[in-house]
From Swiss-Prot:
This is Large ribosomal subunit protein bL34c. InterPro entries: Ribosomal_bL34, Ribosomal_bL34_CS. GO terms for molecular function: structural constituent of ribosome. Pfam families: Ribosomal_L34 (PF00468). One of its GO terms (biological process) is translation. Residues 23-48 are annotated as: Disordered.
Length: 48
């Protein structure tokens, strides 16, 4: 089994990587959000 990389991260550091504002800051992140909206995801990004 592979190592779970988020197991020892703080909530703040996770948000810095995969929170909504982090997604909006890059073109690739905006593309990700667009895809999740299209699919109908209730939760677009990691919540705090």
């Amino acid at each position: 089994m592979t190592k779970r990389t988020l197991s020892n991260k703080t909530r703040y550091s996770i948000l810095k990587l995969s929170g909504f504002r982090a997604r909006m800051s890059t073109a690739q992140g905006r593309k990700t959000l667009k895809a999740r909206r299209k699919k109908g995801r209730k939760q677009l990004a990691v919540r705090r």
